[in-house]
């Protein structure tokens, strides 16, 4: 994806895994990484299985899941990543993952119930938030896109006052609030719009990001 977008060059950095990883695209080097302890990953896999929910995580190069299903196929249509199916996850996890994601394509209420049941255990350990109506993200406590924006500015010695961020889902709110200018897409959730300084006239599928670049970067 970085190559397709022309971002694999000097001066380009990627914040991945909802803030769990900061990557120097040109040097192909990890600058900052936060991970989920394996004991927590085991609990999440166990509890999602009990709830009848699909869950996957990641290695450095692949998506890791217990079984490939409709959720895997839909997810990888948008996120092009190799898939490794391993029924013995999480026992076979070689290293702590940056994030885990729970997916239900048809029953949001089931995920809401799982989230509510997990919150007492997750407090102080794991942050949970939606990145789409069907994707419930799990990252280490205090990891977010907002924290990652601040960390990247610190690493590059760039004032936070010189930052612009844009998004449309719950996992984008911390970043929108952290940046000097936070923009919400026209199709963003109400909570995202409430946190933003600017709401685009176009949605994310119709040049919403280009609108922000023209207004706040190229003007």
Regions found by a protein language model. Give the residues of each.
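Mg2+-dependent phosphoryl-transfer enzymes with acidic/Ser/Thr/Gly-rich catalytic loops
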Residues: 137-219
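Class I S-adenosyl-L-methionine
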Residues: 3-6, 49, 115-120, 150, ...
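Short, structured coil segments at secondary-structure junctions
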Residues: 8-10, 18, 122-124, 178-179, ...
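Flexible, glycine-rich phosphate/dinucleotide-binding loops
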Residues: 21-23, 64, 109, 137, ...
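Active-site phosphate-binding/coordination module
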Residues: 1-72
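Conserved acidic, metal-coordinating active-site core of Asp-based
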Residues: 47-166
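Alpha-helix termination/capping residues and helix-transition junctions
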Residues: 7-8, 94, 157, 193
């Amino acid at each position: 994806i970085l190559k397709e977008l022309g971002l694999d060059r000097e001066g380009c950095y990627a914040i991945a895994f909802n803030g769990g990883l900061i990557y120097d695209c040109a040097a192909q080097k990890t600058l900052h990484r936060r991970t989920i302890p394996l004991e927590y990953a085991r609990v999440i896999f166990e509890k999602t299985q009990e709830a009848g929910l699909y869950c996957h995580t990641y290695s450095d190069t692949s998506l890791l899941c217990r079984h490939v299903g409709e959720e895997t196929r839909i997810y990888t249509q948008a996120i092009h990543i190799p898939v490794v199916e391993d029924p013995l996850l999480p026992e076979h996890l070689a290293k702590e993952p940056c994030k885990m994601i729970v997916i239900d394509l048809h029953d949001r209420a089931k995920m809401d119930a799982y989230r509510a049941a997990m919150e007492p255990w997750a407090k102080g350990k794991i942050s949970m938030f939606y990145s789409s109506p069907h994707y419930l993200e799990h990252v280490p406590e205090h990891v977010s896109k907002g924290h990652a924006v601040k960390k990247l500015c610190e690493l590059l010695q760039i004032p936070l006052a010189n930052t612009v961020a844009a998004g449309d889902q719950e996992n984008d709110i911390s970043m929108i609030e952290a940046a000097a200018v936070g923009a919400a897409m026209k199709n963003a959730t109400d909570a995202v719009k409430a946190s933003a300084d600017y709401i685009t006239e176009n949605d994310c599928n119709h040049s919403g990001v280009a609108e922000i670049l023209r207004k706040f970067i190229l003007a």
